[in-house]
Structure formats: structure tokens, C-alpha cells
Amino acid sequence: YQRDDLNGFTLGSDPQRHVGAKSGMSAELAYLDSEYPSVFVTHVYKNNYLPFGNTLWRFNGDYFSDYGGDYGVNQCGWGWGAKFFDVNNSGVLSLYVANGFIAGDPQKSYWYKLAVLSSAPQGIVSSPKYWPNMKGQDVSGHEQDCLFINEGNNRFYDYSNDADLQIDQDRLLGRGVAVLDYLNNGSQALTVSNQLGRAYLYKITHLNTNNWIGFKLIGTKSNRDAVGVKMEITLQNKKMIRELYPLNGYSSQSDSRLHFGLGNADRIEKINIYWPSGKKQELQSDIKLNMYHTIKEEL
């Protein structure tokens, strides 16, 4: 859907470009290396049954194309919540995806029964009373969440099996994912909610010397929480864009501050804020790094 200032929203996607319906569990937005945002959508992936998985839609100015497979983020089981975050203040965004559906006996997979059921007449498939008994069956349970680290050039690698990271070792049924800096030190942490289980809180224990900057934005003419605000930070050889949508994702709410990892850059060339009201505001480029700043929309 595309924003139409006169009529609200209009259907902007070309029906001829549709790639078919999928499971669509959660959506997340990020500017990876473009002036346009990319949209990551979690789906249900199961090898030999549902082989397509997550999608990463990138806009080229005319239409969106799926780069989920090219970037290595399409396979992560029965996906739910997902969030982009900067794992080391390098300015490069990585991605965490929670997964898992029903944890039963690992030796009793319900997927085969679902595959057999799908070949039955539509009247049987659409009526749950004809479905095989699910008691004790496993439907994408015991899956491990995915930690996709962006190693540059937007190529992501799943590090969830790295024993040192201790990612979802209990293989709980992941649901919501939120990003927050609860220590206010520029190190973004993750909290993950799990169905029928305890929540996870992941934090970086080995801080590096990369610089960062963060902003708490307050709207005046715009909404007070500045939801929908867009910020651009220009460094000597790089421009970074963030938008504030803390409510994105499945059953989660993230830190309402915008965070920028700056890598080894020790100064900022330019800072522009594009408020939801339509107003553009420029900040002084000599602003202090490695702290959060509160910025109020100019009247």
C-alpha cells in the first residue's frame, strides 16, 4: 500500500508481480545500504514441506524484489518476531529471529501428516474435524532462534549455533523480540519472549571502542512520541538512516530512542531530522558522541 495524501492509502503493488501467498508472521523495517527502506517478513520454513521461508523486500525506486535467499536470511524455521539491531556499534545492522510453534515428541513430526492432508479434497482440508490428532505431535518445536550477523555487503550468517553466544539453548517457543539499551551505554540488548517459558535477555558482554550516538525525540506539531520520524546522519564516507517504529514486530515494543553505531568515526558531518509533520530540522554536527540526546521538534 502506498501513501496517498488525498485518500489515505492505495494499493500500490502490481497484482502481476505477486509471488503467491505465504504465512506472514511479523514485519520489520530497516535501511540497509539504500535510500529506501527494506522490509523483512518472517514466514514458516520447513525443509521438504515449505521451502521458501522469510522474505527481505528491497525497493529499487519502481518495485520491491525479494532478496531473502541472496542475503542468507530466508531459513529460520517457524518464524515469529524479528528485529534489526547493531550488535557492535559498527553501523551495520544484524538481525535476530525468534521461532518455534508446538513442541511435542521430536520423533513424532506432524508435518508428514499435514502433507498427506494437503492432498485431500478441499472440503476435508478446510475442516479441522478431519485433521489427524495432534496430541503429542511436534510441529516445528525445539527449533533454535536465528542470530543473523551482517558481515558486510549485506551478507548475513547465522551464528546461533556458536556455543560461546548461548543463543536459545533451551530451544523454547520464541515469539516476540524487542531491542533496548537498558544500561544506557550504547550497547543494544535483546529481549525475547517465549510461549510457555521464561523470557531471554541477551546483552553484549565484551564492549569494543566503536563510537555511537542516540536520540530521544519529542514531537510538538508531530505526535509527542515522534513515531514515524526519520533521521539521517552523514559521516565522512557513509550515510545512515533510521526511522522510529518501536511497535514493529510480533507482540513486542522496543526502545523508543533512535540509535546509531558510528564505528571508528569520531565526528558527524551532518544530522537531519524529518518529522512526521513534514518539518525538516538540522542539528549541529559538532554534537557530543557516546551519549543520548533529547531533541524537541522546532515550532
Can you annotate each of these PLM segments?
Residues 34-42, 89-98, 184-193:
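Acidic/hydrophobic-patterned starts of short beta strands in beta-sheet-rich repeat architectures
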